[in-house]
Swiss-Prot record:
The gene is end3. It comes from Aspergillus oryzae (strain ATCC 42149 / RIB 40) (Yellow koji mold). Pfam families: EH, End3. It is a peripheral membrane protein. Ca(2+) binds at residues 55, 57, 59, 61, 66. Signal peptide: none annotated. Residues 314-324 have a biased composition (Basic and acidic residues). This is Actin cytoskeleton-regulatory complex protein end3. Component of the PAN1 actin cytoskeleton-regulatory complex.
């Protein structure tokens, strides 16, 4: 068993490169990763093989774990650790969270035996046409409840894990297997969530008296592989969209609704002894790191929007207004200037400076003039008193002269 692994310092360095390229997104597309990968000077055909190996989930993009795988392969090729790109991904390079995908891909090469296809001659009495691929929200919620109760750790469903559900339905075993084959074109031992929902949807309609469809639409079949499924009725093909109403009563209308009996007695499901092996990146890059990247990106976007808004505002302010409308910007400017002037006058009045100081000086001068006037009046009164005293003295002198 190989002792090779991606070291901690490598993962941290790869994270710095990944974060600088991803712009806050969890994945890199081909064009984003090309600038770094092509710096290795490897041939394009080598880089294509590296990309195919690293893209474990086959979605055409590299998340951080897959990016680490690609970078390590590139460095090993550049440093001579590898002479050629390996045909399969070494076990020590398989991300722990995606090891089930690698094992499933390898297992597909064995092509397990598929259930025998049962040809439907459409001669079953009481069955109706009008199957619809559109899932009503209530039905979809019930399908997801069944799926969540029975999925394994890889998020997949095995045929036999739903046997109690089959037993509770009024659906022949041959029709159950036909529905399974329809959503499992690769004849895998398990199917993913989207295929499971479609499988349960087919069983629901068969339980309600509708014939099982012969084929799956090409877009829907592709969605089983891409893990994406379109549940919007507006996107359905006309032949599927305008079928009979799923709520139409059928000869089996008095039966319990699809899955109700099964769900009512369902215990804990989805148990599995599966233990993934491979490189574990979960202890290195935490959610906080992603949050920092997202916040930096949001900050840059806000700064860009702010600059754009400021430029637009300046452009509107500088643009002449010839349409005869009121320039509210000019009105606001004049009002602010008037307010500033009044505030300055009030401040000068309180501090005794400026024009208010001149007014205070005039008032003080008036008070001084008034005080001088009062002093003049006092002096005049004092002079009159002295004159009376002088006159009295002169009279006394005259009387004294006469008496001699």
């Amino acid at each position: 068993m190989s002792n090779k692994k991606i070291e901690q310092w490598e993962i941290e360095r790869y994270w710095e490169i990944f974060a600088s390229l991803a712009n806050g997104q969890p994945r890199l597309n081909n064009s984003q990763a090309a600038s770094v990968l092509r710096n290795s000077r490897l041939r394009d055909e080598q880089l294509e093989k590296v990309w195919d190996l690293a893209d474990v989930d086959g979605d055409g993009e590299l998340d951080f774990e897959e990016f680490c795988v690609a970078m390590r392969l590139v460095f090993d090729l550049v440093n001579g650790e590898l002479q050629t790109v390996p045909a399969v991904l070494p076990d020590w390079l398989v991300p722990e969270s995606k090891s089930h995908l690698v094992h499933a891909t390898r297992a597909l090469s064995t092509q397990p035996e598929q259930f025998e296809r049962i040809e439907d001659e459409d001669d079953t009495p009481g069955l109706k046409d009008g199957f619809e691929w559109y899932m009503k929200p209530a039905d979809k919620s019930k399908y997801e409840e069944i799926y969540n109760a029975n999925r394994n750790q890889r998020g997949e469903i095995a045929f036999e894990s739903l046997q109690p559900l089959y037993d509770s339905l009024d659906v022949p075993d041959t029709d159950v297997r036909s529905a399974w084959n329809l959503v499992n074109p690769s004849a895998s031992h398990t199917i993913n969530k989207d295929a499971t929902l479609a499988f349960l949807h087919i069983l629901n309609y068969r339980h309600e008296g509708f014939r099982i469809p012969r084929t799956v639409p090409a877009s829907l079949r592709a969605s089983f592989e891409n893990n994406k499924i379109d549940y919007q009725v507006d996107n359905a093909r006309p032949a599927q969209k305008w079928g009979a109403d799923g709520d139409t009563e059928t000869p089996t209308g008095r039966k319990t609704k699809f899955g109700d009996t099964y769900l009512s007695r369902l215990g804990a499901g989805g148990k599995s002894s599966y233990t993934p092996k491979g490189t574990n990146f979960s202890d290195t890059i935490q959610d906080e790191e992603w949050e920092k990247v997202r916040l930096r990106r949001e900050l840059a976007e806000l700064e860009t929007k702010l600059n754009s808004a400021q430029q637009a505002s300046e452009g509107r302010r500088d643009q002449p207004r010839n349409d005869g409308r009121t320039s509210w910007g000019l009105v606001k400017k004049e009002a602010l200037q008037l307010l500033e002037y009044k505030e300055r006058e009030l401040r000068e009045l309180r501090e005794g400076t400026g024009r208010s100081k001149e007014g205070q000086n005039l008032e003080r001068l008036r008070e001084d003039v008034k005080a001088v006037g009062e002093q003049v009046d006092g002096l005049k009164s004092h002079l009159a008193n002295r004159n009376e005293v002088l006159a009295d003295l002169r009279r006394q002198i005259d009387e004294e002269k006469v008496s001699r």
